[in-house]
Regions:
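Conserved "right-hand" nucleotidyltransferase catalytic core of DNA-directed polymerases
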Residues: 2-204, 268, 280, 288, ...
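Acidic beta-strand-to-loop metal/phosphate-binding motif
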Residues: 169, 228-236, 632-634
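Short active-site loop/helix that positions an aromatic residue
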Residues: 177-178, 237-248, 260-264, 483-492, ...
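Metal-dependent phosphoesterase core characteristic of DEDDh/y 3'-5' exonuclease domains
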Residues: 190-194, 236-301, 328
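Nucleic-acid-processing active sites and adjacent nucleic-acid-binding tracks
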Residues: 193-231, 362
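Conserved catalytic core of nucleic-acid polymerases
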Residues: 352-355, 359, 429, 560, ...
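Short beta-strand
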Residues: 476-477, 864-869
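Helix N-cap motif at beta-to-alpha junctions
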Residues: 878-884
Length: 933
């Protein structure tokens, strides 16, 4: 047994301290390099740092490198040596790989660097096209592209998507990844039947021979712009954007192996081409190809700074890999349930559609935003004052908040500060005593005088809370900690965080705040502040600086797990790097600037987060304008999700009651509310609820409660959870129980639909939309089986057993904890699984509408496709085409593109700017009064 005893050593004088420091320096100077390495390896190092230091030690031990600094050998120096060693090692390895790549170049790889070789390239391309026409596999693939519902529907409208006659794999090498500004410097393609690949170089920043850009692009322009020739890529939207940046009008960009990979398995570890090809190398027939990634050969740099030969070989290998993977994907999708249907009926068209929407963007009235900034800033100042007044935010408030949030740190600081003050006084006294004994003519005397002066002039702060570094001198309404104190500790708001996240408490995120703002009058001042602060900080001030090269505001579209669209901002290169015009004379200069430019400028915005239900949010949206001589026309699908529920009930479970209400033009939520809550139909309407609200005759929000019931049953919720959800609507527990018990009797097909969805999930671990688009839930099947074992052990009949909580007490503590973890996991999967079958199907139908808008309105009529958001589509129509036919066409697109067993409905409006809405009848009546647009 070893005792570590520390004795209180006497305090040292300044001279003793100096002597000790000198001794330490001598000791460090005599430290051997082995001792230094031992010291550094004993320090706190991440795994990556430890490997880097190890590389440094190996290199120094072998004599390959030496120290790069003088003085004591430090961790920082070791890391820097290691980084240099690793960088040099990687560079040597890259050069070796490059040499190997060039030395093993296949005979069927052709790198084109002469303009005179371009015609032969096109001849080979056309020969491939001819060969594919008589190939059985390609005829099968062409049928997948051609034989689709939307193509047939467009033919009924007189719009023809050209029949597919070829299918080849392509890729581009570029100056960067900005999809609006960067340019291509080379393109590659693979000819499957001829079994050969080509790379055309024209933008390399080396002294090597290469093609002229204009000739290289012109030679394939007609092929790139011909929709009958399908061009496949891995990340098609990116390469489509590059060809657009190069001045082309690409068509037939209808296969993306990256997107198809997500259709096949959205849980791949990586969706990069190299990891996927490496994973499926044997089944796709790519065993003869190496696994070098872009980084393996070129590091993090641009391919344009390397020779056309090495980049060309790499690029051709990419398209060969891409083709082998693409062909295998199609074969697999045809074998796997309805995956080919999900892909070819919808997804193949979306790359051109989505890219068109993103690149269209909005014209922004920046002058209006400037006016709003002034107005909203004044309102924000008033809102901040109102906050301080309403919540008595003064010095006493800040004092109490500081002690509540930072009390321990503040008290520790006070204790330490008192010691520091005592120490300073002691040092001052020592210096003054030593000064008395010193010779006034010595340097030491001057030094003591200077130290005394500093001690007297630089007095330490008084040890009171207000001087502590952690003291809060100003409340920050954007701080979670400050808001938690205000909401939960000062205002004593009941914590409803678990409604949003069952694992969390005292949340202050936007979802929880939205819940409180609706039900807590005391939070109105905070609500007013939050609304204005968000509008100003996120939109009004940022949007004018987030415009792209065309002066418009764009957004990046993303699809959530169900397939619905969301939008977000993105990083791009500065618009300052743009050339007014690109030609053969200035192209390489432009490429050099683009290659060197960083992609760090924030552009675009999240459109769906601009509030639509407040006056201020509406005014921000109204700054989004159509182009000159255009007017917006927009439409959204009405109640698409309950209509899909009704469709499934009728077609899968022979229950027509829901669908029949839509066929009769009734509001099912009102009708079912009247039946289930046993109340008069009129009282259940939203208009009656709003008319009576705030009066002695106020009634519960029966229609909203009915919508909540459909959600609750769809998510498999027990009564207690359903009741919690309808309490805010004024529904009594007795009313809720009556309605809940009657639901299955009135709508037996709905429960059957939910149970069938859950049973499918429990058997296969996935669910799908009505078009076969899957969503998989890894681990669900195994965890549900384990949950069933635990339920059986304690006599629980089902997850909705009313005595579930009580019965789990029969389990041991560890098993009980596991039980509730499994309940949460499986419950989340079940809700998402059912939601996918409904919301995902709605997203698929909207996508079909988008495809029709693209082909019929954008390509056919010259409209601009500005937006897809939730269930809404918006186009800018040339004013000359804004007749009664325009809204009728949009109505047809939304309701007559795909048919359910009940009618679809939409709400079409005409807008001179976003949110300034007129029904078609109102608009044309107004135009007649005013004599035109």
């Amino acid at each position: 047994m070893q005792l570590n005893v520390k004795l209180n050593a006497p305090k040292q004088s300044a001279e003793a301290t100096a002597l000790q420091s000198a001794a330490d320096r001598v000791k460090s100077a005599t430290e051997t390099i082995d001792e230094a390495w031992q010291r550094i390896f004993a320090m706190k190092l991440t795994d990556a740092q430890r490997l880097t230091v190890l590389e440094a030690k190996k290199a120094m031990d072998s004599g390959k490198v030496g120290r790069i600094k003088t003085g004591k050998f430090s961790k920082e120096e070791a890391l820097e040596i290691g980084r240099r060693v690793v960088a040099e090692k990687n560079e040597r390895e890259r050069k070796r790989r490059m040499e190997e790549t060039v030395a093993t170049k296949p005979d069927n790889y052709f790198v084109i660097t002469k303009d005179s070789d371009l015609p032969r390239l096109v001849d080979r391309l056309m020969l491939e096209v001819e060969a594919q026409k008589s190939d059985a596999w390609f005829r099968k693939a062409f049928d997948l592209f051609n034989n689709t519902h939307i193509r047939k529907r467009l033919l009924q409208e007189g719009v023809e998507i050209p029949l597919v006659t070829s299918f080849t794999e392509w890729d581009t090498e570029t100056s960067g990844t900005d999809t609006y500004i960067d340019l291509s410097g080379g393109y590659s393609f693979w000819l499957p039947l001829l079994n050969e690949g080509y790379y055309v170089a024209y933008g390399h920043l080396t002294d090597d021979e290469q093609c002229t850009r204009s000739n290289a692009l012109e030679i394939v322009k007609s092929f790139i712009e011909d929709a009958q020739h399908i061009k496949a890529f891995h990340n098609t939207p990116f390469d489509l954007s590059m060809f657009l940046n190069d001045g082309m009008r690409p068509r037939g960009f209808r296969y993306d192996s990256m997107d198809a990979a997500q259709i096949m398995n959205e849980h791949e570890d990586s969706f990069g081409l190299k990891p996927l090809v490496t994973k499926y190398k044997k089944p796709i027939g790519a065993s003869h190809l190496d696994d070098f990634t872009f980084e393996d050969l070129f590091g993090n740099g641009s391919p344009m700074i390397y020779s056309p030969e090495i980049v060309g070989i790499y690029a051709i290998k990419d398209v060969e890999k891409g083709w082998l993977y693409t062909k295998w994907q199609i074969d697999m999708m045809l074998k796997s349930d309805k995956l080919a249907v999900a892909y070819f009926e919808i997804r193949q068209y979306l790359y051109e559609v989505n890219t068109t929407i993103e690149r269209t963007g909005f014209v922004i009235d920046t002058e209006e935003l400037a006016r709003l900034e002034i107005e909203f800033s004044e309102k924000l100042g008033a809102a901040i004052k109102a906050l301080h007044d309403a919540y008595n935010i003064d010095d006493q408030f800040l004092y109490e908040m500081s002690l509540a949030l930072k009390g321990d740190k503040i008290r520790d600081w006070i204790t330490s500060q008192k010691k520091r003050i005592e120490k300073q006084a002691e040092m001052l006294s020592q210096c003054e005593e030593e000064l008395k004994r010193s010779n006034p003519t010595t340097k030491k005397y001057e030094q003591l005088q200077e130290r005394i002066r500093k001690y007297k002039t630089n007095k330490l702060a008084e040890p009171v809370p207000q001087n502590a570094p952690d003291y809060i001198h100003e409340i920050n309404f954007d701080s979670d900690q400050h808001l938690q104190y205000l909401i939960y500790d000062v205002l004593k708001i009941e914590d409803k965080s678990k409604i949003i996240d069952k694992k969390k408490e005292r949340l202050t995120n936007k979802d929880v705040l939205a819940l409180y703002f609706k039900s807590e009058p005391s939070l109105k001042p905070l609500s007013d502040y939050s609304k204005l602060s968000t509008l100003l900080g996120t939109f009004v001030r940022k949007i004018p600086n987030a415009l792209d090269k065309d002066g418009r505001l764009h957004t990046k579209l993303d699809t959530v797990s169900t397939g619905r669209y969301s939008s977000k901002g993105y990083l791009g290169k500065s618009n300052d790097v743009l050339f007014a015009e690109i030609n053969d004379d200035n192209y390489l200069e432009a490429m050099r600037i683009l290659v060197d430019a960083e992609k760090k400028t924030r552009k675009g915005t999240n459109l769906q987060n601009i509030p639509a239900r407040t006056d201020e949010g509406t005014r921000v949206r109204m700054a989004f304008k159509p182009p000159i001589n255009h007017t917006f026309i927009g439409s959204d699908l009405s109640s698409i999700e309950p209509r899909i529920q009704a469709h499934r009930m009728a077609t899968e479970f022979n229950d027509d009651i829901f669908a029949e209400m839509y066929r009769k033009g009734l509001d099912p939520y009102v009708e079912f509310a009247a039946i289930l809550f046993e109340i008069e139909r009129e009282i259940c309407t939203e208009s009656y609820y709003k008319a009576m609200r705030g009066t002695p005759d106020e009634v519960p929000a029966y229609r909203k409660a009915m919508k909540q019931m459909f959600l609750a049953i769809g998510y498999g919720q027990a009564f207690d959870m359903f009741y919690k959800g309808v309490i805010p609507f004024g529904i009594s527990e007795e009313q809720a129980l009556v309605a809940y018990k009657k639901f299955d009797e009135i709508l037996p097909g709905f429960k059957g639909m939910v149970e069938a969805t859950f049973e499918h999930l429990r058997k296969y671990g996935w669910t799908a939309t009505i078009f076969g688009q899957k969503r998989r839930f890894p681990g669900y099947v195994e965890k549900y089986k384990r949950l069933c074992q635990l339920m059986k052990r304690c006599g629980i009949e089902s997850k909705n057993d009313p005595e579930l909580g009580k019965k789990t007490n029969k389990l041991h503590r560890k098993d009980r904890s596991e039980f509730w973890d499994l309940m949460r996991f499986t419950g989340g999967c079940e809700r998402a699984a059912f939601n996918h079958t409904i919301q995902g199907s709605g997203a698929n139908i909207l996508q079909l509408c988008m495809i029709r808008v693209y082909y019929q309105c954008v390509l056919g009529l010259g409209w601009e496709f500005a937006l897809t958001l939730h269930d809404e589509l918006k186009c800018a129509v040339p004013n000359g085409q804004l007749t009664g036919d325009a809204p009728r066409l949009f109505d047809s697109i939304m309701t007559d593109t795909y048919h359910l067993v009940l009618p679809l409905a939409c709400d079409t409006v005409i807008e001179p700017c976003w949110m300034d809405e007129y029904s078609p009848s109102e608009w044309f009546a107004k135009q007649n009064e005013n004599g035109g647009i």
